[in-house]
Swiss-Prot record:
One of its GO terms (biological process) is ATP synthesis coupled electron transport. InterPro entries: NADH_UbQ_OxRdtase_chain4L/K, NUOK/Mnh_C1-like. The chain crosses the membrane at residues 1-21, 29-49, 59-79. One of its GO terms (cellular component) is respiratory chain complex I. Keywords: Electron transport, Membrane, Mitochondrion, Mitochondrion inner membrane, NAD, Respiratory chain, Translocase, Transmembrane, Transmembrane helix, Transport, Ubiquinone. It catalyses: a ubiquinone + NADH + 5 H(+)(in) = a ubiquinol + NAD(+) + 4 H(+)(out). Belongs to the complex I subunit 4L family. This is NADH-ubiquinone oxidoreductase chain 4L. GO terms for molecular function: NADH dehydrogenase (ubiquinone) activity. It comes from Rusa unicolor swinhoei (Formosan sambar). Core subunit of the mitochondrial membrane respiratory chain NADH dehydrogenase (Complex I) which catalyzes electron transfer from NADH through the respiratory chain, using ubiquinone as an electron acceptor. Part of the enzyme membrane arm which is embedded in the lipid bilayer and involved in proton translocation.
Amino acid sequence: MSLVYMNIMTAFMVALAGLLMYRSHLMSSLLCLEGMMLSLFVMASLTILNSHFTLASMMPIILLVFAACEAALGLSLLVKVSNTYGTDYVQNLNLLQC
């Protein structure tokens, strides 16, 4: 395994650890999710480029589309929660309150 793949896997693990540790604020959770999606995108792109597997060349673009949709939904949820409660604490998101 090359050094580039090790660095990308380390970036993914750091973002995952950040998501697990800093889950009190919604903004930090969204940033960690974006870091995870970015590292997955780079890993998929490098793997497809190195293996010359042209049939799967659309997979990184599809992953990028899902990351953009996730970011848009996350930011709209952040705006709604911060306008409603005044803070971005995840503990304010209770599905039973509706």
